[in-house]
From Swiss-Prot:
EC numbers for this chain: 4.3.2.1
UniProt GO MF annotations: argininosuccinate lyase activity
Subcellular location: Cytoplasm
The keyword 4Fe-4S is annotated on this UniProt entry: no
PANTHER family: ARGININOSUCCINATE LYASE
GO-annotated biological processes: arginine biosynthetic process via ornithine; L-arginine biosynthetic process
GO cellular component: cytosol
Species assigned in the record: Mycobacterium sp. (strain KMS)
Entry protein name: Argininosuccinate lyase
Sorted UniProt keywords: Amino-acid biosynthesis, Arginine biosynthesis, Cytoplasm, Lyase
Family: Belongs to the lyase 1 family. Argininosuccinate lyase subfamily.
Pathway: Amino-acid biosynthesis; L-arginine biosynthesis; L-arginine from L-ornithine and carbamoyl phosphate: step 3/3
Catalysed reaction, written as an equation: 2-(N(omega)-L-arginino)succinate = fumarate + L-arginine
High-level lineage: Bacteria, Bacillati, Actinomycetota, Actinomycetes, Mycobacteriales
Amino acid sequence: MSTNEGSLWGGRFADGPADALAALSKSTHFDWVLAPYDIAASKAHARVLFSAGLLTEDQRDGLLAGLDSLASDVADGSFAPLVTDEDVHGALERGLIDRVGAELGGRLRAGRSRNDQVATLFRAWLRDAIRRVADGVLGVVSALATQAAAHPTAIMPGKTHLQSAQPVLLAHHLLAHAHPLLRDVDRLADFDKRAAVSPYGAGALAGSSLGLDPDAIAAELGFDSAADNSIDATAARDFAAEAAFVLAMIGVDLSRLAEDIILWSTTEFGYVTLHDAWSTGSSIMPQKKNPDIAELARGKSGRLIGNLTGLLATLKAQPLAYNRDLQEDKEPVFDSVAQLELLLPAVAGLVSTLSFDVDRMAELAPLGYTLATDVAEWLVRRGVPFRVAHEAAGAAVRAAEARGVGLEDLEDAELTGIHPELTGDVREVLTIEGSVNSRDARGGTAPVQVAKQLNVVRDTADRLRLRLRT
């Protein structure tokens, strides 16, 4: 049997828990990251206890000095959990009592429960973690924008269904990956509005009768407000699920970018060469240069999705208020943050060092009759209904395929035989440069529009950086 030494509960029990239960309950192996937040909250709690008349000035100052000493020892690693500590809260109370004595140290627990404590600490940790992740995402956006700026006129095959579709600018394609990542950062910034509500003062579920001031603690800990409902405050983990979703969405967006890089780096595509520092080799095949970062990004997206779905499954059928199931709420979120903090700098480095073969992309851009839409739209500009123009352009593709030539190589007689308006003048649009230049509406792939898109991406990233700092 465990002795229950150092536990925050036990007066009602004659003996400690069974060893198997103690092992099952233990959480210091993952919740110790909350220790600095726990100490900061304890300092705020000591001040509120003093304001409520529950501590003398000397007692408050003694607790604050003990907590400062404990914080220093936690930071340098000289204080750490013992095998007998159940969780971060119990370990830190033990550390405080070691420094100020049981009589004074035991006063700090008045008016608070692990239920409101951990809900507050989780929110505080996550608010900081989200900012770190957002910075990493913006690093990837910056790498994409830099590559786009370096290739303002490079043309590549645009694809749908992974089949050649229409010519587009490489910069246009790269910025198409930047936009969803910017939306992810916007979601992270918006998430803070809901995370910045402090559960502190809710107690186990019913609030406190000791005259404590939840708003004062909320303000000291950097929250926007205290919770309006103590039951909801201790039981709610929708903030964690929301964060897990955005983290998973980042993983999905990175995975799509990674998939493009994986394809582009193959011999068959040949669009990019990977930098030696951001790729790996094979243990048996000397020629290999493998896109490991991109493949790990693709693989880790599944892990992030799993963390989200696992958390939602944990939350789905819990009655109000707090249940011990919620011990399982933190590890998936902690893991998602940790994985992205590893992954994002690597993806940014990979993207920033890609070497593009722009000649190869330009050579492939017209293949697969990617200018057929330009033929149809040229006919529309001459007054032909689009339905008819679409049929005529398709017939031109069939004729070119039958001869094994490009659309621009069809004879004038062949063109007019398909449709009387389809004359040799159509060749003026049958270049990849003419195709991309013609698509100059907002959002299009014309160079003038893509230059505007690049400015939008950079301006949006700057605004989001500023928003995340406030």
